[in-house]
UniProtKB/Swiss-Prot annotation:
Cofactor(s) this protein cannot do without: Mg(2+)
Record InterPro entries: COD_ChbG_bac (IPR022948), Glyco_hydro/deAcase_b/a-brl (IPR011330), YdjC-like (IPR006879)
Gene designation: chbG
Function (record text): Involved in the degradation of chitin. ChbG is essential for growth on the acetylated chitooligosaccharides chitobiose and chitotriose but is dispensable for growth on cellobiose and chitosan dimer, the deacetylated form of chitobiose. Deacetylation of chitobiose-6-P and chitotriose-6-P is necessary for both the activation of the chb promoter by the regulatory protein ChbR and the hydrolysis of phosphorylated beta-glucosides by the phospho-beta-glucosidase ChbF.
Protein source organism: Proteus mirabilis (strain HI4320)
The protein's name: Chitooligosaccharide deacetylase
């Protein structure tokens, strides 16, 4: 039986360069799935591109750390925007959980308006849905909508998160990130998953063509390196040789 490999490109909608990079890796590479930032400046462009990509799984990249929220959530914003102070609020047990529920629903509804259908699955920008206070909210919401979510199993075990009833891949790997991007690194994620006995795996990626909005990102030109690796023809063959079949989160349902 083939192992399922979901290659997800985060940050769909972040910019046109990000969008074009993800599309390139879907059409000419191994990206099968992406997750959309519905409050980002390039999201309408992303939704337009998707009309010609029927086989690309598109999920919701829930964000509480970037841009303007889609609902009135004053406790989470400063000067009207979201930011990384969320970590400090979480550490101090000061997260406004009711506001987070409202914003999650607002971003979900915005996704449906933009793409004309529910998301393929749910994950989050900067992995905020794996915070111990936020995970139960996202998990319950996803179960109500019968949607899969990304689960970092190691982090879930560390934080003692209840994943019962959650639809997700057996494994999740975020190693394909940073300054040492290569085909060998990508294939290592597959070999590691097999060694752990996982039948399904999601690998997180961030491929992009670089444009001006991305130049201010702390993770910029590495995105272009990811694109180059993910579109190498030899990579698809190496994946097949390891017994993996490319798919999306919908293949788990």
């Amino acid at each position: 039986m083939a192992h399922l490999l979901i290659v997800n490109a985060d940050d769909f909608g972040l910019s046109r360069g990000q969008n074009y990079g993800i599309v390139e890796c879907h059409r000419h590479g191994i990206v099968t799935s992406t997750t959309a930032l519905v409050n980002a400046e390039g999201i309408e462009h992303a939704a337009q591109l998707c009309k010609e990509l029927p086989h690309l799984g598109v999920g919701l990249h829930f964000t509480l750390t970037m841009g303007q929220p889609l609902s009135p959530i004053p406790s989470l914003t400063r000067n009207g925007v979201l930011g990384k102070w969320l970590w400090q609020m979480a550490e101090q047990e000061q997260l406004p959980l009711d506001e987070i529920r409202v914003e999650l629903n607002a971003q979900y509804q915005r996704f449906v308006e933009l793409f004309g259908c529910p998301p393929d699955h749910i994950d989050s920008h900067h992995h905020v849905h794996m915070f111990k206070q936020i995970f139960p909210i996202v998990a319950e919401f996803a179960q109500q909508k019968a949607l899969p979510i990304r689960v970092d199993r190691l982090l879930a075990q560390k934080e003692n998160l209840n994943t019962q009833g959650v639809i997700s891949s057996d494994g999740f790997d975020s190693q394909f990130y940073g300054d040492e991007i290569s085909q060998a690194l990508f294939l290592k994620t597959l070999d590691d998953a097999k060694a752990r006995g996982e039948q399904s795996l999601e690998v997180m990626t961030h491929p992009a063509f670089i444009d001006n909005p991305l130049r201010v990102s702390g993770y910029c030109f590495q995105r272009l390196t990811e694109l180059e690796v993910l579109t190498q023809s030899s990579l698809k063959q190496a994946i097949a040789e390891r017994g993996y079949q490319l798919g999306t989160y919908q293949d788990l349902i």
